[in-house]
Amino acid sequence: MYNLDKFQSQAVKCLSKDTLVVAPPGSGKTTVIINRVKHLIDNGVEPKNIIVLTFTKSAAENMRSRFKSICNNIDTPFFGTFHGLFYKILVRYYGEVSIISTSEAYMLIKKQLAQITEDVSDDKVREVLNNISLKKTTQRYDTNFQPSLSKTIFEDCYRVYEEYKDKKRLWDFDDLQLKTIELLEYNKNILRSYRSLFKYILVDEFQDCDDIQIEFLKIINENIFCVGDEDQCIYSFRGSNPEVMVHFEEEFPRGDKIYLKFNYRSKKNIVDLSKVIINENINRYKKDIEAFDREEGKIDFYVPYDEAEQSKKIAQKIKEYKNKGQKYQETAVIYRTNMESRSIIDRFIREKIPFKLLDKDFNFFKHFICEDILAYLKLSIDPSDRESFIRIINKPFRYVSKGALVNFRKSNKSMNCFDLLLSCGDIHPFQVKKIEDLNKDILNLNRMTLRAAIDFILSDLDYLDHLKDYADKYNQEIEELLDIVEEFKVAAKDFNKIINFLAHIEDVENNLKESKNREIDAVILSTVHGVKGAEYKNVFIINAVDEIFPHKNSDNIEEERRLFYVGVTRAIENLTIYSPKSLKGTFREVSQFILNGNLASNKLEYDGGFKVGQRVLSKVNGEGTVEEVDRGVVTIIFGTNIMKRFDIKTVSKAGLISIID
């Protein structure tokens, strides 16, 4: 045994047929698994009779490497993923098995989405793929699957995806699982042979198993050793469920539970905070977790004015860490959703702080709404920009026919796109003046400030009406689309001229491309999902406000709390949490997780982002200037010295008053 504490040692030496090791963050679960394998081999078990299952190839490689470092003269058991094991089983029985690649599936869905909807963002493609996977992994147990996106869009993509695989004779990872279960159920000889071969099964991250993987373990099981933590179950969108751990004895009646006690990662007060937060959940084991390191770390909680001030404070703190000799890569900025990274990326580019985006394909400005608005802006600068013209000419629908656009695309003339369209024919007389007026309006955008130009596109050019029609057509919440619009407006806030903003967008894209291949020292930017299993000396959690953390689209508050818990437990020494008063110009409540963790008083006074001297716009009273902010009340002067007082929470939540500057 290698420096095991008594709880780890108990787990490693456990004689029970079926064992569940409940392993909180930083408790050394990988150490336990490696030493368990060594213990089995030292006690006469053949390596070929041991399989260790993980959820990622990198985790499997890490375990294999660590095993070899302590047992370099011993044959190595199987270390791999569930899918890797299923592949080996099926190849042995069926011969050749061809798997659809991740990139192939991604591009197939992206192409199909482009034919039926405007939203072909990375997030939307992944949502479709996740729903396809979830349907396939749950349909054996629940035939009433409801996708998280438009049912029409999902069913169309699902049909195309399955038809493509059938035509190409391809399987995906979910097919591997289903085919393996079917094979073992219907061929008892094969089942018996694998039961005799797989005498000892060890499972890492047991809480992440889906229903099919649990079924496989029950079918094949002779002796199972599972390590996991229901408090870190954050993949319900893939079919995982904390119930599998909480009710372990029901699934595996011979089961026994062992609790690892010490967190070897985080300082004492960080561990204590994480316990207070997660103890609010009901569907879990009660655990006695202690920090091995009894020293206190540094926990800070800030309520900045908005996302701009939040990103500025983070950049300043990271520079302080760097000046003290720390590496950038010792720091992570963590958020609930990818969209929240936009303001951080902007700030880091300006401050020349190197960063690495773990979700390499994300770029907020690639969302279809952003690309539409940008196309209008680009066309105002360059009226001959064909790509931008084609993108927006029917957004909203302006009755420009497919035939007219076909002729437009065929033309080799280099000229103003509106004039070219009118010269191509297939344009009805009643459309001519509308197209000419649209040309004038778009050219006039370049004479406006950026803010005015965006507002003109949204209102006068009826782009908001287009989004409402889009939401109705695809059964999507309009609020989700308006969130993108508001984030875009915030991104543009610091720019006065269109040309400067477009240059900034290009700069962001170039920096994101560089960050994909960035192996140099860089700050990590990631969603909580992306950093699960990782640890950092310094962790910043941003936008800890209700409707973001917990997210407004989630109806599972316990999973949202588990996500926050996972974020907190990534920190080794320094944890900083931010709850901006205002996001996208809207008043925000501090996250209930912050209040549960006693980081902030329930009696926090909110100023809604209002500051003395600010210009504001009231839907009722027009433009005004903030005179005073005191005890939840804002005083505003309108017109010719008309003074009015408002309850900040009321006007902010109702959206009655917005901040101009």
Predicted feature descriptions by range:
Residues 295-297, 326-448:
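ATPase/helicase motor core of nucleic-acid motors
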Residues 423-534, 548-552, 572-578:
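Accessory C-terminal helicase-associated subdomains
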Residues 20-33, 253-256, 262-355, 380-382, ...:
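Helicase P-loop NTPase motor core
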Residues 78-86, 202-205, 227, 500-552, ...:
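Conserved helicase core region in the C-terminal RecA-like lobe
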